[in-house]
């Protein structure tokens, strides 16, 4: 157990560093690209990605996750998964090439025809690394993954900026996507000793599909739950509106990607190794949820309160329409950071059948809400997303997962109430100071001082009230420093 805990913490560190640095590199590229490109050009790519993103779930078929979850896998499984994914990727590329005119017609955007054909090449390239990624994650070898993601993000950003400066418009975003996929594949193959043999065993696929079949179904339905808003905006409101909405959505998801997704990539394989020890799973799960809420709640709160200076400083005045959308989506993001973790329990316990049914339910809620909200434009869609997440999805999704490990919804709320209270207090102080003290300051100075103020206030609050998650994080860092850090001893409430 101690070895697993150590490997999990190491994995969290490397995965966190991977995602953080990757997001910093991508954010830096996006800051420049947003000033060079228009909302319409971002919206055009977003229209295509709605469909290709869905096909990405289908191409993987959940088999990569099945390799991670299965206690033992043989070359028979690995070879079969590899060749099936290559076949699926090639087929999807061909299908999208044929369907490109239909995509362009659906949105009434002729430019989408060639964009769809080129972006679909990602399926062929991406199918070559499914097994290698699964083996890396299964072995908790996140240090190697760090370098792969860092180099691929850096290379793709350079390509995108070069194309944008050359006047390539939306094609600079396409080049960024393809470059990242290709570089990632090359580096994964370079580091992996596993090579596919010319062998395929249908029975091996059937063994894996027992787990991945429902997971594939869940991935498909939850994808539309998370992206139906973009499809409807692109079809009925327009590409410029989709560009505005997509940028706000991307900013909101930065904390989610850097915290929740990072933790998920480590917690799923870690919990799978102790799936038969319900008490151990429950303890590990609650510890992770506490840490997630400790980080995501203040980030979402601060981003919502400081949305105006953040958008105007980082992206420029032509993206001003995304400010209010960002504020609403951040409110939804706090709930997402918690109910998304329910998937760890379903996956680690092998209950993808229940996960699939809940995915159908949440997708129905999202589709219904967004269709109604679209009558009031972007604001209506954003409100539908928020209301659906809190009122109809949070409790049903999580409470069923908690039963798998004898964990009540009330117990979950008790574990996140401290970070929520501290984050809300911090947000109130930031809002008041922005309104009555810093409102007239220059935007960049206003943003910088408010971010610093938010960090200080939140740190004081969590230390003063000794939140359990705060103490756990500090003790982990203190142990890793050998107890020598006076600051960490103070943060933990010990005498310096």
Go through each PLM region and give its residues.
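Hydrophobic alpha-helical transmembrane segments
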Residues: 113-120, 148-193, 207-213, 218, ...
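Interhelical loop/hinge segments that connect adjacent transmembrane helices in multipass membrane
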Residues: 1-4, 8, 143, 186-227, ...
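Transmembrane helical elements of multi-pass membrane transporters/channels
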Residues: 11-22, 26, 173-176, 180, ...
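Signature of the first transmembrane helix
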Residues: 4-63, 87-102, 117-122, 152-161, ...
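Membrane-proximal transmembrane or re-entrant/amphipathic helices at the cytosolic face
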Residues: 402-412, 431-496
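Helix-loop junctions and terminal segments of transmembrane helices
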Residues: 26, 58-75, 79, 134-138, ...
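N-terminal membrane topogenesis motif
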Residues: 1-27, 65-68, 72-83, 112, ...
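Membrane-interface junctions at transmembrane-helix termini in multi-pass inner-membrane proteins
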Residues: 5, 66-75, 124-148, 166, ...
């Amino acid at each position: 157990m101690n070895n697993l805990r150590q490997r999990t913490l190491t994995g969290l560190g490397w995965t966190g560093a991977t995602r953080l640095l990757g997001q910093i590199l991508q954010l830096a590229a996006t800051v420049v690209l947003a000033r060079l490109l228009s909302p319409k050009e971002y919206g055009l790519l977003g229209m295509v990605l709605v469909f290709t993103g869905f096909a990405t779930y289908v191409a993987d078929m959940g088999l990569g996750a099945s390799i991670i979850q299965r206690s033992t896998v043989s070359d028979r499984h690995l070879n079969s998964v590899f060749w099936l994914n290559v076949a699926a990727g090639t087929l999807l590329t061909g299908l999208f090439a044929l369907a490109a005119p239909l995509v362009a017609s659906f949105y009434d955007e002729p430019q989408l025809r060639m964009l769809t054909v080129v972006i679909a090449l990602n399926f062929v390239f991406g199918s070559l690394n499914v097994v290698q990624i699964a083996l890396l994650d299964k072995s908790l070898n996140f240090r190697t993954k760090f370098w792969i993601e860092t180099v691929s993000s850096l290379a793709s950003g350079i390509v995108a900026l070069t194309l944008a400066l050359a006047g390539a418009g939306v094609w600079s975003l396409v080049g960024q996507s393809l470059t990242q996929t290709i570089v990632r594949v090359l580096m994964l193959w370079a580091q992996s000793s596993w090579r596919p043999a010319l062998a395929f065993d249908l029975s091996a696929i059937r063994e894996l599909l027992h787990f991945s079949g429902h997971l594939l179904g869940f991935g498909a339905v939850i994808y539309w739950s998370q992206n139906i808003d973009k499809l409807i905006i692109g079809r009925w409101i327009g590409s410029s509106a989709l560009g505005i909405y997509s940028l706000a959505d991307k900013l909101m998801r930065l904390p989610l990607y850097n915290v929740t997704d990072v933790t998920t990539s480590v917690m799923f394989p870690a919990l799978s190794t102790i799936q038969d020890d319900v008490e151990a799973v429950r303890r590990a799960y609650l510890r992770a949820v506490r840490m997630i809420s400790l980080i995501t709640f203040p980030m979402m709160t601060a981003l919502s309160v400081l949305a105006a200076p953040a958008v105007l400083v980082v992206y420029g005045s032509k993206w001003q329409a995304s400010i209010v959308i960002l504020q609403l989506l951040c409110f939804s993001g706090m709930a997402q950071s918690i109910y998304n973790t329910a998937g760890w329990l379903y996956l680690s316990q092998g209950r993808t059948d229940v996960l699939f049914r809940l995915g159908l339910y949440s997708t129905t809620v999202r589709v219904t809400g967004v269709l109604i909200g679209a009558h009031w434009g972007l604001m209506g869609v954003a409100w539908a997303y928020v209301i659906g997440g809190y009122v109809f999805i949070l409790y049903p999704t999580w409470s069923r997962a908690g039963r798998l490990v004898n964990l009540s919804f009330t117990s979950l709320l008790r574990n996140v109430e401290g970070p929520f209270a501290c984050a809300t207090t911090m947000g109130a102080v930031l809002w008041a100071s922005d309104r009555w003290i810093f409102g007239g300051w220059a935007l960049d100075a206003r943003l910088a001082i408010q971010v610093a103020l938010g960090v200080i206030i939140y740190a004081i609050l969590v230390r003063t009230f000794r939140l359990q998650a705060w103490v756990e994080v500090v003790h982990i860092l203190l142990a890793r420093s050998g107890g020598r850090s006076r600051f960490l001893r103070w943060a933990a409430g010990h005498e310096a």
